[in-house]
Amino acid sequence: MEITLGIAMFTVIVLALAVIILFAKSKLVNSGDITIEINDDPSKAIHLPAGGKLLGALASQGIFVSSACGGGGSCGQCIVKVTEGGGDILPTELSHISKREAKEGYRLSCQVNVKNSMKVELPEEVFGVKKWECTVISNDNKATFIKELKLAIPEGEEVPFRAGGYIQIEAEPHTVAYKDFDIPEEYHEDWDKYNLWRYVSKVDEHIIRAYSMASYPEEKGIIMLNVRIATPPPNNPDAPPGQMSSYIWSLKAGDKVTISGPFGEFFAKETDAEMVFVGGGAGMAPMRSHIFDQLKRLKSKRKMSFWYGARSKREMFYVEDFDTLQAENDNFVWHVALSDPQPGDNWDGYTGFIHNVLYENYLKDHEAPEDCEYYMCGPPIMNASVIKMLKDLGVEDENILLDDFGG
């Protein structure tokens, strides 16, 4: 009898808990259809089932908001203005959104739960963003840890981007073994030294990452990226390798790749001011895009120089391209500084870190460095060093333009 009573009591408790959970869920999650009004324009309103995040909800309706981290909340790019609904701002958003912005309704769309109808404001350029399935033309090493991925846009289509812009690339769940990478023998030294062939990248979810374009608008029908493989650092060799860079390095000619875009704000100012470009590593991508666009498409006569930092001669690329531009344009010069030239390099050019080389060999004696516009993209330590040097020279923030990708 006691056993039967105990079982009955247990069953009642379980059923009561189930009812409470279902009731709470009904209050917390609206399972019906909701409406997201956009920019107070009835024609832009979307209707969809409740659930998920605002970033994904918009994407499901063909509205692609920039998100370099793929919705992880770390890049801070997917900011939108929520004027009604959306709940309270989350602590994870406050590292990217100021208190003033939060009061005005700004949110990270990847963190906003879609439970009820809401009203949002989006930049108009978002509605020009599209998605394409591209075909890999080539994926060749340009340096030890950098590949140039060249993609063909579907016939009859074009990506209407501006120089300095970027696209987002997608990947489904996958497993990539580094031992299967196609890497020319000349680049094997460091791969062997650090035994990088042992790594495997296993991804169990759909991922999205942003990459600056190396191509410029007149290179029709293609998108070109410079992608640095994100290997685990030597001081933490058991850390997982970069998910998207590993995926991209595994791609071969003929493979299909989904991209969306164009996005961007790292655009050249329309002035007559002197332009100084500073790059390093895969930060070459937007530098190439900008410089080619200025000299080849716009036929710009603005004074401009390009200062690129590399470790050794093996890490230099697009050398012939920039040599040709320099020969054809009196208003353009470019310089490379090697931080660790090898004995076999027979290097007689600049050596050291690029910010020091730029200062000692040009800006130190420049009559008005504060009047120049500085465009830069490279490893974080390079960016920080260049910015400090420019600040010390009195350059205002408005003349320092930084692309945080590509490095």
UniProtKB/Swiss-Prot annotation:
Primary enzyme class: translocase
Catalysed conversion reaction: a ubiquinone + n Na(+)(in) + NADH + H(+) = a ubiquinol + n Na(+)(out) + NAD(+)
Residue ranges of every copy of the 2Fe-2S ferredoxin-type domain listed in the record: 32-126
Positions of the UniProt region annotated as Catalytic: 272-389
PROSITE patterns: 2FE2S_FER_2, FAD_FR
GO molecular function list: 2 iron, 2 sulfur cluster binding; electron transfer activity; metal ion binding; oxidoreductase activity, acting on NAD(P)H, quinone or similar compound as acceptor
Subcellular location field: Cell inner membrane
One GO biological process term: sodium ion transport
InterPro entries the UniProt entry points to: 2Fe-2S_ferredoxin-like_sf, 2Fe-2S_ferredoxin-type, Beta-grasp_dom_sf, Cbr1-like_FAD-bd_dom, FAD-bd_FR_type, Flavoprot_Pyr_Nucl_cyt_Rdtase, FNR_nucleotide-bd, NqrF
Cystine pairs: none
Sequence similarity: Belongs to the NqrF family.
This protein's name: Na(+)-translocating NADH-quinone reductase subunit F
Native organism: Pasteurella multocida (strain Pm70)
